[in-house]
Amino acid sequence: HMKADPYANYAELRPGTASRITNIENLKWTDSSWMTAREKWNHKKEPMSVYEVHMGSWKRHPGTEDEGFYTYREFAKEITKYMKDMGYTHVEIMGIAEHPFDGSWGYQVTGYYAPTSRYGTPEDFAWMINYLHRNGIGVIMDWVPAHFPKDEHGLAEFDGTATYEYADPRKGEHPDWGTKIFDLGKNEVRNFLIANALFWVEHFH
């Protein structure tokens, strides 16, 4: 079975599984004021109120139960209004990396370096971050380095062997979720995950 690129920044819309070529090096950022203020912000002294939200279920377009997702851009406008009305300072977005199964809420990731294409392109994702930052709203990402699904196009048995996961199923299988568990004893796996955390901060602010 063909594997998706573990470092791809964009993926086909499910049920497609292929990686797509895109360039995220030239994303247009307009949140310089926010970024400057964030450097001086003291989270130990400043008030902080976090609203956790799953984009796919928070709000949908009427009459479209199965799909009807708001795009990154639509969501940014809607959530900003709500956040300002309610007095929240930060939004924590659940499970935003690419994942094949809607029901996992983004917690069974196949594309660790790609914002999910359910809601738009990487450019649209950056637009959302820009919009929220310009409106004074901080963005927290729910990062999911614990386990990953067995989908054939994903990380499981990537080269035919236990590449990212433990080879011993007693360690490498998550009994509750039926997923694979990262082998953090491997330098390559630790590097993959640490680089991934840095990637989101550096590329998407």
What is the predicted role of each segment?
Residues 38-45, 54-205:
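Substrate-binding/active-site clefts of carbohydrate-active enzymes
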